[in-house]
Every structure is written in C-alpha cells, then in structure tokens.
Amino acid sequence: MKFLVVDDFSTMRRIVRGLLKELGFLNVEEAEDGVVALNRLKSEPFDFVVSDWNMPNMTGLELLKAIRADAALAHLPVLMVTAEAKKENIIEAAKSGASGYVVKPFTAATLDEKLNKIFKATGAKEAA
C-alpha cells in the first residue's frame, strides 16, 4: 500500500512517515503542499493520502475537494491531520469527503485506530 503524506512542515512529514513505518507501512512518499500532492496523485498511483489541513498554496481541505472532484482520484481514502480540533473544521472535512480526521499530536496507536476504521469502511487492506 502506497501512502502520500502531505504537510508543509518537513518534521511533521517525518513523524507521520515514522508512525506509518512503525505500523508496517513502508511505501510512503511526501509532498510539501496540496499543489505538489495533487500533481503527484495525478502522475503516479497512490492508495492512501494523509494530509495536513493548514498549508500554503493549497490547503488540505482544498486538496481533499480536488481529490473528490477528480473521477480518477475520488476513490482514494484521505485522512486529515490537523492541530485544529474545532468542531466546524471536523464537520467541514466530513462534508467534503474526508475518510477520517486526527488531531495533532497523536500516537501510532491513534493513527492505527483511524487507519483501521478507514480500511474497514473502504474494504482496503490492513497490512502493507
């Protein structure tokens, strides 16, 4: 399973990559914003997107909406990762088609729980 981790903060990308590795997911690529991510998604196959909310150029929410609007990408599970625990953000993400939502900071166990819920809902594999 190939993941794309999208975050403008390189340390956060490394943290998420490390947590995914801890969970057995070794095929992880990175993008620093939504524009780069969308270009990568359109040019190479990915199975799962983990995206930050607040980024320059194209926010995570804008990326999510672009993914859902593209017939070739609309099936991709998207887990939104953010420091924003505001109810309205969670509702907005859900309305826009987010597969899940996790608030920073989080542990490998929390990430595992969120991923497994999404895998169960989408019928995707739970192993790398």
Language-model segments: what does each one mean?
Residues 10-29:
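Two-component/phosphorelay signaling modules centered on CheY-like receiver
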Residues 17-18, 62, 85-100:
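Alpha4 helix (beta4-alpha4-beta5 surface) of REC/receiver domains from two-component response regulators
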Residues 30-39, 60:
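Helix N-cap/capping motif at the beta->alpha junctions
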Residues 39, 61-74:
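Short amphipathic alpha-helix used as the core "switch/output" element in two-component signaling
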Residues 44-50:
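Active-site beta3 strand of CheY-like receiver
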Residues 55:
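Receiver (REC) domain active-site loop signature in two-component systems and cognate sites
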Residues 106-115:
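C-terminal output helix
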